[in-house]
């Protein structure tokens, strides 16, 4: 059996991840699993911790370890970025999602119940390659990655707002109302439209009233037939609050791409430019206000999971 280097974020999901981490730790101890663990306290810790671990890892141990990440997409993204920046060895990643944003985990077949997800990991005997998105940001000469999505504009503003929200009591008692309040705040905080330029293949597309730019990784979708076009691009124009709320409702109950102010494509590579300072986030990680000149492409990375090693009934457990 593999040994595990565990990076746990007990602060994920408003601190609820702490209980999940304790359950996982007890299970690992009770079943004599070989592991060493570290916890994160602030943003950036996961990236720092994995790079320190790799720096001290002997060459002979490269095939011994799996990195087990317990937290949200942001924590997993930090670990992935740290591994790629260290450029030592692509250690397989295992993931137990303890946040409320679990779309990427769902696409990989990872159970929402932490102990069931742990069984899927411990039952694995080999790594499985999954497709992620690599981006190169030319303004800052940075290379990064995203597992789920990269957002510019109002959607990033909304994600940043929720990470700092103070009405946690309202979110637990009346989630829909908390969501509406956050959406309205983010809408009015993102007052100005911005210009976005896309190059898909040899064609350029120009948008002068962009309000949301969202880039989504769709490579793992079980019903996705266009495997040669796994990057989903959505641009939403700036509209009044009433039309915007229609867009929000349509996202939940219908197909927003049919709205005249929503522009949608799928592609396998992309160049997108936003030459104004806009709020940006990647996999729920806040990047703050930045200029974006992005070149995107697919890469493969090894994940340590056997999704089919548990029953469908177990995989549906919360």
Regions found by a protein language model. Give the residues of each.
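ATP/NTP phosphate-donor binding region
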Residues: 1-67, 77, 312, 318
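Short helix-capping segments at alpha-helix termini
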Residues: 29-32, 85-91
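Structural motif
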Residues: 38, 69-70, 94-96
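Short Gly/Thr/Asp-enriched flexible loops that form oxyanion-binding sites at enzyme active sites
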Residues: 75-88
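Catalytic core of DAGKc-family lipid kinases
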Residues: 87-209
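ATP/nucleoside-binding phosphotransfer catalytic cores, i.e., glycine-rich phosphate-binding loops
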Residues: 200-202, 225-318
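Glycine-rich phosphate/pyrophosphate-binding beta-alpha loops
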Residues: 212-224
